[in-house]
Amino acid sequence: MKKETKVLFIILCVLLCCYALSFLHRPSRAGVFSSSLMHEPDVREIAEIRFSIPTRAEPVEMGEMTLIKDGARFYLRTGNGSYPVRQEIIDRFFSLLGAGRSFLPISARPQDYPDYQIDDGHASRIVFVRKDKTVLSELFFGMTDAAGAGRYVRTGTSVKVFLIDNAFEPFLTVAAPFWLDLQIYAALFRGTGIQGLEYGNHSVIRTEANSDAFRALESFLEKFSCIDIYSAPPLQSPQTARVRLALGNGTELRFSFTPLQSGDYVFFDSRSANAYLISGYTCEQLLRHIEAIN
């Protein structure tokens, strides 16, 4: 064997030994334990959820949102409305809260909190409250780890910081479109249909001749989707358009839409005090279907 080959062989052996030894001396995950963020009995007692979520980095701005349980459902309450939360979202959220997961202890020193963005000024904070207004749990979610697969977390009853999986990321938001079903008429025409329409000076009764146009309007409204809620006081102007629909079950639906400078429209209906935002394009399509009926 040539001298150069022997040297390369020796170097290769040394590197292989170092590689093997690196596995023997890798930092251990000592202290890892399995638990859940909340116990199942506590999850069942949740009657109110208060969110404080960073919506902008430096300078940090916090977005606030409160979900309140009324009967079997949770609602997003604003000063001018009460919006039902999607049940499948709540079910998934509560399932994650009570699920077993691995906790890796990271720090027990509050002075380390800024390193994980888990201090009060940067963390996403969620408070769970009972019906009697006592606090069940308070959770603080910090930044993700370097790989993006884990997230730092602490509870309000402990100074310890843990690393858990990042399954909660989608829920760290106060964006209404995530929590609410904005297809507000998806189930309206189950078992009934539109029998009459009034729009401005335009008044039409459903007949065999225009039945297809009415059916097209029903189909459009079933897929009709708002882009957000409108939490300001009711808005009316000379440009507000109003529509009345007479339904086959003896009820009626009244709605109005008012243009904003942004190009979107504020949308109200008679079923509740809730107000929504719809896009200019959606409003154009709605008017097209209404005006096609004669």
Task: Specify the residue positions occupied by each region the protein language model found.
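Secondary-structure "cap/kink" motif recognition
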Residues: 1-294
